[in-house]
């Protein structure tokens, strides 16, 4: 049974991010610079939602001179990191929140036909009756809000530790964001 009480929302986004040194500003422009991108868009798992949207974008925007390359998130990030170090042009699939937006300055390419759906949300949901059964928990969840940058900061710390110490990194986040955390408490 899916809980039916939405109690908070966080901003999220998916699309095609790029480094600011890449002078392309919109997805349709990619076809004009396909050679600079080695005729590739680097993606993740072929069945991921963002990959389906990227295949749609290739069709809708006529990006037939670009090939969507699937792989793991790790392989996509490795290729992206290597290209950034070499100051090469690269285009990848991306989403917020993700630690790469904290690690590197990135911009989403404009999506004039809204293939990726524009701004999205991450929702916190609770089971029916939680407000009556556990009012403090409900109140905490109701006011719990953090920015994509705050989420990404925690994610980059966890990633830097190769996911070995998420609890310690959560404590680090709490220590460095005391006023934010206190604003969530009943």
Where are these regions (language model features)?
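Extracellular/periplasmic catalytic domains that process cell-envelope and extracellular macromolecules
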Residues: 4-7, 34-36, 85-86, 117, ...
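A bilobed periplasmic-binding-protein/Venus flytrap-type ligand-binding module shared by bacterial periplasmic
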Residues: 9-20, 120-133
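Short amphipathic alpha-helical coupling segments at ligand-binding clamshell hinges
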Residues: 26, 132-144
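Solvent-exposed, polar/charged alpha-helical surfaces in well-ordered, non-transmembrane soluble domains
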Residues: 28, 32, 52-56, 78, ...
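Ligand-binding pocket segment of bilobal, Venus flytrap-like solute-binding proteins
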Residues: 44-112
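Domain-level detector of nuclease and nuclease-like folds
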Residues: 76-77, 125-127, 135, 140
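C-terminal functional modules
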Residues: 144-186
């Amino acid at each position: 049974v899916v809980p039916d009480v939405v109690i908070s929302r966080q901003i999220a986004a998916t699309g095609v991010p790029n480094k600011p040194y890449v002078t392309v500003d919109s997805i349709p422009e990619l076809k004009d610079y396909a050679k600079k991108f080695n005729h590739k868009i680097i993606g993740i798992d072929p069945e991921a939602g963002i990959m389906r949207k990227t295949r749609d974008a290739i069709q809708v925007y006529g990006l037939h001179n670009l090939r969507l390359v699937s792989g793991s998130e790790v392989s996509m990030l490795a290729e992206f990191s290597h290209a950034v170090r070499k100051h090469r042009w690269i285009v990848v699939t991306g989403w917020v929140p993700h630690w790469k937006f904290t690690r590197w300055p990135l911009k989403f390419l404009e999506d004039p036909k809204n293939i990726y759906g524009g701004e999205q949300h991450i929702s916190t949901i609770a089971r029916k009756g939680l407000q009556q059964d556990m009012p403090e928990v409900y109140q905490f969840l109701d006011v719990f809000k953090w920015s994509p940058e705050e989420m990404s900061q925690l994610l980059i710390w966890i990633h830097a530790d190769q996911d070995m110490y998420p609890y310690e990194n959560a404590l680090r986040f709490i220590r460095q964001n005391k006023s934010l955390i206190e604003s969530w408490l009943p």
